[in-house]
């Protein structure tokens, strides 16, 4: 049996907030930097999404379906594609039409809801699943959480939503001596299969490809194939997971990244040792070799491979607790406009911008970050949250007034109409006696 290569890309663009000052609170409830969102989205579409989608489409056709890939595209990104650059949606539809591309489910707003609210997590995943079905005509059967965040409990929640296959990080501190180049199972739900990212080989492309100071530069397709073969010498599958913006945005076109990706499928297919598979195909093809216990959440972020990139300091924790404390009240109010804003305010990027880690991962945290400091990001976000809280409280108060009035009307005593008196009987008219003649 051939060994498997599973190539997966994350596609996400956040809904960036405008500069929102203290004096805007209670006066202006438009929170978003529409100009920045449109400008950045269109730039990345032209540099990455459109050319890379075309490259993948040509590779699928050239290799007669032997080349396969998988995507997860956040709802926040899909909304911006539809609003600012519909051609991107069309290019993903063309990939979907080949039948060789799998679209995964995730949280609609690329949120941290899996760490805070089971009901909100379920709501977002189901909303995202419905959106993928509407746009691409396929139903997601595999799941990847925001930034590959995973734990045994999160896996169980995904299982309860119908997902038997989950992607996550092959983090060193939970793997120990185990290799990420096998499929594992969730100990709570043993039939749920876990695909683990080979972070070393993935990051060779995502982060080190254009680094001229890297001892292995330049990276060519044949060299990369030899590394994958060595890594999987005694193993079954190599999972290469990375941001889609790697191609043309993080790694510029001048670096040769598109030429590399154009050559890569042919190198693997010609070698004959590997075959490309989608995540769901991998889960069907390979058996789980063992349970993988993950008590505390892991992710693919930073050296720690945990959730400290979003919740590692007091600023992040305060903002996180503040926004998720509103979930219950919002579910009572059930206002569509508030729900839409609430989704955007949950985007994990807002908390990522507040990260104070500036060591080996500092440059990663600065990329796409509109703020000069984490404190500026925190203040701006909390100003927006304060205005949102006012709107939510007002909506709840209006609902209370409405319910009170309805109850008063419902419980008001019914007044009986006074009984009508019977009309007085008239005395019979006495006829005058007839005159005697």
Range-by-range predicted roles:
Residues 88-105, 122, 126, 138, ...:
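Acidic, His- and aromatic-enriched active-site or binding-groove loops in soluble protein domains
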Residues 126-180, 246-264:
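Catalytic domains of cell-wall/extracellular-matrix polysaccharide-remodeling enzymes
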Residues 410-437:
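Intrinsically disordered, polybasic Lys/Arg-rich low-complexity tracts
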Residues 118-147, 227-241:
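CE4/NodB-like, metal-dependent polysaccharide N-deacetylase domain
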Residues 2-9, 15-117, 141-144, 164-169, ...:
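Short, well-structured secondary-structure segments
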Residues 114-116, 174-182, 204-206, 287:
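Short, charged, surface-exposed secondary-structure boundary motifs
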Residues 53-57, 89-93, 122-132, 155, ...:
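Generic structural signal for well-ordered alpha-helices
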Residues 2-50, 182-192, 196, 211-214, ...:
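Active-site and substrate-binding clefts of carbohydrate-active enzymes
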């Amino acid at each position: 049996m051939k060994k498997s290569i599973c190539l997966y890309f994350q596609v996400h663009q956040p809904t960036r907030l405008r500069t929102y000052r203290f004096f805007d609170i209670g006066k202006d409830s438009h929170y978003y930097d529409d100009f920045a969102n449109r400008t950045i989205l269109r730039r990345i579409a032209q540099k990455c999404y459109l050319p890379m989608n075309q490259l993948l489409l040509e590779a699928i056709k050239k290799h007669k379906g032997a080349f396969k890939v998988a995507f997860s595209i956040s709802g926040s990104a899909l909304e911006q594609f539809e609003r600012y650059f519909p051609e991107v949606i069309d290019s993903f539809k063309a990939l979907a039409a080949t039948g060789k591309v799998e679209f995964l489910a995730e949280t609609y707003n690329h949120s941290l809801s899996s760490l805070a609210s089971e009901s909100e997590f379920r709501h977002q995943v189901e909303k995202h699943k419905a959106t993928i079905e509407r746009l691409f005509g396929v139903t997601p059967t595999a799941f990847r959480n925001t930034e590959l965040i995973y734990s045994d409990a999160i896996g169980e929640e995904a299982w309860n939503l119908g997902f038997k296959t989950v992607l996550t990080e092959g983090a060193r501190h939970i793997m120990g001596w185990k290799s990420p180049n096998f499929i594992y199972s969730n100990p709570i739900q043993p039939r749920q299969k876990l695909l683990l990212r080979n972070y070393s080989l993935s990051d060779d492309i995502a982060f080190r490809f254009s680094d001229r100071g890297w001892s292995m530069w330049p990276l060519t397709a044949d060299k990369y194939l030899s590394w994958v073969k060595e890594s999987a010498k005694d193993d079954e599958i190599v999972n290469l997971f990375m941001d889609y913006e790697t191609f043309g945005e993080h790694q510029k076109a001048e670096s040769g990244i598109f030429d590399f990706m154009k050559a890569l499928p042919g190198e693997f297919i010609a070698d004959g040792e590997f075959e490309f598979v989608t995540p769901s195909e991998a889960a069907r093809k390979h058996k789980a070799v063992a349970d993988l216990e993950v008590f505390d959440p892991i992710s693919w972020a930073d050296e720690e491979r945990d959730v400290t990139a979003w919740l590692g300091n007091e600023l992040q924790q305060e903002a996180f607790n503040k926004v998720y404390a509103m979930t219950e009240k919002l579910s009572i109010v059930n206002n569509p406009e508030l729900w839409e804003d609430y989704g955007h305010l949950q985007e994990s990027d807002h908390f990522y911008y507040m990260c104070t880690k500036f060591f080996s991962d500092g440059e990663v945290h600065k990329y796409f970050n509109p703020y000069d400091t984490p404190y500026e990001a925190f203040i701006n976000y909390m100003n927006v949250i304060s205005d949102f809280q006012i709107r939510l409280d007002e909506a709840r108060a209006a609902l209370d007034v409405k319910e009170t009035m309805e109850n008063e009307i419902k419980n008001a005593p019914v007044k009986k109409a006074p009984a009508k008196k019977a009309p007085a009987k008239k005395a019979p008219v006495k006829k005058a006696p007839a005159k005697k003649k």
